[in-house]
Amino acid sequence: MKKNQFANKLIVIDLLSVQRESFYSFLTEGLAKELNNFSPIIDYTGKLELHLVTNQLVIKKPKFSFEEAKRRDCSYTISINIVTQLFNKNSGDVKEQEILLGEIPLMTQKGTFVINGAERVIVNQIVRSPGIYFNSEMDKNNLKTFNFLIIPNRGAWLKCEIDKNDLIWIRIDKNKKINLSIFFKALGIDHDDLRIKNAFRQPEFIYKNLNKDENYTQQEALEELHKKLFPGEPATSEASTKILYFKFFNPKKYDLGIVGRKKINKKLDLNSPENIRILTIQDILSGINYLINLKFGFGNIDDIDHLANRRLKSVGELLQSQISIGLIRLERLIKERMTICEQSSLVPSALINPKPIFAAIKEFFNSSQLSQFMDQVNPLAELTHKRRVSSLGPGGLSKERAGFAVRDIHPSHYGRICPIETPEGPNAGLIGSLAIYARINPDGFIEAPFYKVNQGQVLKNKGIIYLDAEQEDEFKIAPGDIRINETNFIKEINVPVRYRQEFTQCPAEEIDFIAVSPIQVISAATSLIPFLEHNDANRALMGSNMQRQAVPLIFPERPLVGTGLEAQIAKDSGIMAISRSNGIVKFTSAEKIIVTDSSNNQITYNLQKYQKSNQETCINHRPIVWPGERIKKGQILADGSATDTGELALGRDVLVAYMPWEGYNYEDAFLISDRLVYEDLYTSIHIEKYEIEARQTKLGPEEITRNIPNVGENSLKQLDENGIVVVSSFVESGSILVGKVTPKGESDQPPESKLLQAIFGEKNKDVKDTSLRLPNGTRGRVVDVRIFSREKGDELAVGINYIVRIYVAQKRKIQIGDKMAGRHGNKGIISKILPRQDMPYLPNGTPVDIILNPLGVPSRMNVGQIFECILGISAFNLKKRFRILPFDEMYESDSSRILINQKLKEAQTLTNLDYLFNENHLGKVALFDGRSGEKFDNPVLVGKIYMMKLVHLVDDKIHSRSTGPYSLVTQQPLGGKAQQGGQRLGEMEVWAFEAFGAAYALQELLTIKSDDIQGRNEALTAIVRGKTIPKPGTPESLKVLMREIQSLGLDIAAYRLPNLHHGEIKSIEIDLTHNKIVQKR
């Protein structure tokens, strides 16, 4: 691929702008807008007014830096102060004060929030846009009925429907149906009103509906409406009069939003000003007119899944609605205080309490479905999490009720939401990812970039034009992978296009727009898969998701075969240290880099060393500049975890062979060489946090000390004089990390202490050892120790004197049971590690690193891995790296195959390795068995593939139990590693025992080895005394089942039937509701 062509297909954008721009607009506009809606507050008597001066909003800097907030386990927040004025209309006094309104978490440069020391992300929510929606449904008689629904931003929903008898009904908030005639009367519209005549295309259809209830007055109609909406409440004339005003015409209770107003104006062809955000009578009349026209075959029904009807709520808007909730609570509080307190002595600070706003913000960040603990396994996982789009959450869908239509890929998703990247399982289709070049417009609709096309010529010099889904429907749009000549004219005569959600063909002269790049359809993670177009979509989905689970390695390596987006994604993830100005590097070390800029100012870049991520992987910076080097603004100073010279590096390129090997790679298992273990190719660092608190007890304070009773000097050698482990110590299971003693009372004394005291009158030490020890199965090096105490000014909970945190880093080499995967969804578990001398080897003696099963390719249809494999070995031998954008068939037919064959031939010519290129079986090599030295019968595909080690490590999964906790109800062992649980002998295992006829083994497993309490105690006694094990009794779970049946009023017990030689067994059916007995024979 030519370099200039490649560059033309990539446009540079900021992948985190979605989060940053939304939060910035909230701080600069949204917050003030919300406060303006709230001000002024007038008390119930109308004598006091509280005004918020929003143009004097003061935002104060955070108390701690972002790093310090994480270290102290507190939130990284800004304080919002506002100038308030209290007007007393009786005395004419005006009191002015600056007041703290609340604290709001501040977004970091990486688009995250620090809440209680943990980084969190606010996910973008995709919801139905406010506006008017027309729909058709089939009723129970299979007749087509029409309806419309007006959805506001805030307030009641209004639904209008035409039934099979051509009668029009109104529903407010899914309540009972209301006759149109009563609704019009309540609105003050008479039957002979001119507005009816002017608003309707078919006025006779309306008059047929209105002549039903002519004798109602407006007051009676309002009272009738009140009865329907609030059944059981008295319909007083005062309450009835206000009902419609509060539902649809009060700006404080009802808000269409600017978007809702625009959508209604466009759909109904109205020109109401955008600042009228309540419903108008004109909106209702025009809506009913459109509905009647639909009945007569005019107009269009709306597609609810079209992205023109769904908008994105990003962090700024979600926060704004949360502030609104807090302000509503605050308003109620202020009005109460205005009534209770003495008016003459009132000041604004006595009225405003920041707690309601604090609480609303805290509730949102700590417990909302959209505020999530950041996925921090690697830089790609972070970036993808911030670009995620969710249909779930408040005001959205729930995964239980969401049907297939909502989850499906819609034509309007093209270039906006990735059709590939979505979770597997119950959330499939409900959670997506923004396409790589998509952006959000101010109204919250997703836009995609295009070039204008004029008479078959692509006008690249005119720049990029962004269109939303609604605008796009009106144009003929060509995909990004059609061929264009040097003068930017489209080569093809007939071009595939999208037009009004259909895929069709048209001449090049009729095309209006063309996509800017073939990859604009897919998300950031999917765009990292080379030869994507040769993979089945299901496997591409797995490949996208598994890249996010790749563990950062000690020695990261950028891929030989990539797509060219690795550098952009690594840079935008915020994981690397990037220069903020031009200058010269003055000093570099593992801890910091000092740069002198053009104004001779020194800028210090502090580097992160062995920091723990949210998923316990290691965040670490490695400097890649040297003293004296001249640097430019935006240049990378230090690589982060999983990056290599500024490019994303999630795995390693290894030599693989596709062949079966003694059944060890059956069913997706992998065989690996011990070279991967000994050379630390797949070694990663994982950091775990261990914490201990020293509390104030009734018997005195707990002490952190080196003087621990009954502990030898050997166990204390790694502790300092305060009893805390020294940084850089190597610790193993059972090692003391923090020495702690707790005072104990007389009753806690063991019998031997009481005996000594009785004989010698000595008092044994009255403390017990409660030290923090390293748990079983863990070892590593202490990388950090943090001590929190009140003396240092740390905020600790009541009753806690000290907190000590120890961070232990473990090096985890690759081992049997670990999960590995490529970028094409080719995943597997390591089943065996072979010595490198036993691995199959190439004719030049090079042993392969991994043996994959060839049967994993045909049925999965992820052929991209074969292309990568062959191009990878060519790249390795040519000492080059290849960057191949997906959908490269635009250059010529079969271009991927031509390219890999061409590069393989070049590699053979350059290296003189004849086995590399064999025309009879391209890409395949005659391999030799490492054990016997004999050649294998058939040639084998050998190449270089980029393989990753995933976060599903066997060390975290493997678990055993001897004795442990039991469930209180069933008396069976608990399940799961966290509960120290056992392995369940389930239904299928029972079948296996039954199939073998192992009746006694099965009986034991289901009774005395499980939940027959009495039986297991008797069995233990019998074993101890050498007697015969008695027969098992009744399992506890059967007793539980019997109790449950008995609780339903059914007496269940075992009865012995009498020996009936000639009689019959009678079956009696009892109808419990009628007390009748029906006898059956």
From Swiss-Prot:
Its EC number is 2.7.7.6. Keywords: Chloroplast, DNA-directed RNA polymerase, Nucleotidyltransferase, Plastid, Transcription, Transferase. Disulfide bonds: none annotated. Gene3D superfamilies: 2.40.50.100, 2.40.50.150, 3.90.1100.10, DNA-directed RNA polymerase, beta subunit, external 1 domain (2.30.150.10), DNA-directed RNA polymerase, subunit 2, domain 6 (2.40.270.10), RNA polymerase alpha subunit dimerisation domain (3.90.1800.10), RNA polymerase Rpb2, domain 2 (3.90.1110.10). PROSITE patterns: RNA_POL_BETA. GO terms for cellular component: chloroplast; DNA-directed RNA polymerase complex; mitochondrion. It is found in: Plastid, Chloroplast. Pfam families: RNA_pol_Rpb2_1 (PF04563), RNA_pol_Rpb2_2 (PF04561), RNA_pol_Rpb2_3 (PF04565), RNA_pol_Rpb2_45 (PF10385), RNA_pol_Rpb2_6 (PF00562), RNA_pol_Rpb2_7 (PF04560). GO terms for biological process: DNA-templated transcription. It comes from the Eukaryota. InterPro entries: DNA-dir_RNA_pol_bsu_ext_1_sf (IPR042107), DNA-dir_RNA_pol_bsu_external_1 (IPR019462), DNA-dir_RNA_pol_su2 (IPR015712), DNA-dir_RNAP_su2_dom (IPR007120), DNA-dir_RNAP_su2_hyb_sf (IPR037033), RNA_pol_bsu_bac (IPR010243), RNA_pol_bsu_CS (IPR007121), RNA_pol_bsu_protrusion (IPR007644). GO terms for molecular function: DNA binding; DNA-directed RNA polymerase activity; ribonucleoside binding. The keyword Transferase applies. It catalyses: RNA(n) + a ribonucleoside 5'-triphosphate = RNA(n+1) + diphosphate. It is an enzyme of class 2 (transferase). Belongs to the RNA polymerase beta chain family. DNA-dependent RNA polymerase catalyzes the transcription of DNA into RNA using the four ribonucleoside triphosphates as substrates. In plastids the minimal PEP RNA polymerase catalytic core is composed of four subunits: alpha, beta, beta', and beta''. When a (nuclear-encoded) sigma factor is associated with the core the holoenzyme is formed, which can initiate transcription. NCBIfam families: PRK00405.1 (NF001616), rpoB (TIGR02013). This is DNA-directed RNA polymerase subunit beta. It comes from Cyanidium caldarium (Red alga).
